[in-house]
C-alpha cells in the first residue's frame, strides 16, 4: 500500500475459479480488503481508504446483481480492513488505525467492540480446535515512537 492508492481507484475484486481462470468481478476500489462470504452468492467487501464496507450479491456467473453500502466508518473509528464471519453470520471487522475489532449483525448494528493494545488491526479469522478462537494480525506501518509505546503489541 502506498499513498497513491489512497487517491486513485486502481483496485479491483477478482475471482479465481477451479481452472485458475481469473475474472474481474468489480473495480474502482482504492484499497480493497475482505471479502467475507455470507453464503455462495452474498459477501462483504471493503474499500479501506474510503472507510466503507459493501454488501454484494452476485449471480452464478459472478456478475454483481446488487451492491449496497453496509457500513461507513468515521475517522475516529479508523478504516475497515480484514474481516470474517462467525457461525451466526455476524461480521467481525478489523479496524486499521482504530485499535479494535467491531462485531456487526446483518443490519449493520454494532453488537460489540473489542479494544486491542495495537493501533493497526489488519485482519481476523476464527480457528482453533472448535473454530471458536479469534486470530488477529497487526501492523506497525507509519507509527511514531510514542504510538509504539502506547500500542506495544503492534
Name each model-derived stretch:
Residues 18-20, 50, 60, 98, ...:
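Short coil turn/linker residues within repeat-based beta-strand modules
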Residues 20-27, 66-73, 109-114:
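A short beta-strand motif characteristic of beta-propeller blades
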Residues 122-154:
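Blade-level signature of beta-propeller repeat domains, shared across WD40, Kelch, NHL, RCC1
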Residues 11-14, 52-54, 100-102, 154:
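A short loop-to-beta-strand structural motif that recurs across blades of beta-propeller domains
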Amino acid at each position: 500500500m502506498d499513498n497513491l492508492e489512497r487517491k486513485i481507484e486502481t483496485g479491483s475484486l477478482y475471482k479465481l475459479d477451479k481452472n485458475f481462470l481469473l475474472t474481474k468481478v468489480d473495480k474502482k476500489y482504492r484499497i480493497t480488503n475482505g471479502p467475507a462470504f455470507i453464503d455462495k452468492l452474498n459477501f462483504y467487501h471493503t474499500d479501506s481508504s474510503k472507510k466503507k464496507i459493501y454488501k454484494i450479491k452476485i449471480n452464478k456467473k459472478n456478475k454483481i446483481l446488487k451492491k449496497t453500502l453496509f457500513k461507513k466508518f468515521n475517522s475516529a473509528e479508523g478504516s475497515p480492513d480484514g474481516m470474517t464471519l462467525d457461525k451466526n453470520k455476524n461480521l467481525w471487522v478489523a479496524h486499521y488505525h482504530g485499535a479494535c475489532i467491531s462485531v456487526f449483525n446483518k443490519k449493520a448494528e454494532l453488537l460489540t467492540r473489542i479494544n486491542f493494545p495495537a493501533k493497526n488491526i489488519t485482519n481476523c479469522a476464527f480457528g482453533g480446535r472448535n473454530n471458536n478462537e479469534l486470530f488477529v494480525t497487526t501492523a506497525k506501518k507509519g507509527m511514531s515512537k510514542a504510538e509504539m509505546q502506547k500500542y506495544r503489541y503492534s
